């Protein structure tokens, strides 16, 4: 089973890849839908540090999960960008 932090990293990477590669609103919405459907059960599918902070303040995310989630999302965003750079060479 995938760990929730790894799911956040993968989901954010997939979403940022689609955002940087296409910029198409329909593709971004479809990518977000797929990421939420696949990762939501495991991690809650925040895929965005702002959403993570909002979930924390709403009491839906524990204090111990906030920093690892945000770090995973930052790494995932950078990884998605780097993948796009490699594909567009």
Where in the sequence are the language-model features?
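Membrane-interface helix-loop junctions and terminal tails of multi-pass membrane proteins
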Residues: 1-89
């Amino acid at each position: 089973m995938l760990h929730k932090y790894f799911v956040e990293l993968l989901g954010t990477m997939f979403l940022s890849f689609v955002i940087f590669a296409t910029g198409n609103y329909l593709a971004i919405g479809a990518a977000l839908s797929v990421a939420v459907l696949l990762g939501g059960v495991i991690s809650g599918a925040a895929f965005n540090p702002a959403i993570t902070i909002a979930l924390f303040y709403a009491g839906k995310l524990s204090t111990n999960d906030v920093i690892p989630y945000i770090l995973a999302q930052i790494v995932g965003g950078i990884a998605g960008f780097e993948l796009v750079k490699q594909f567009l060479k």
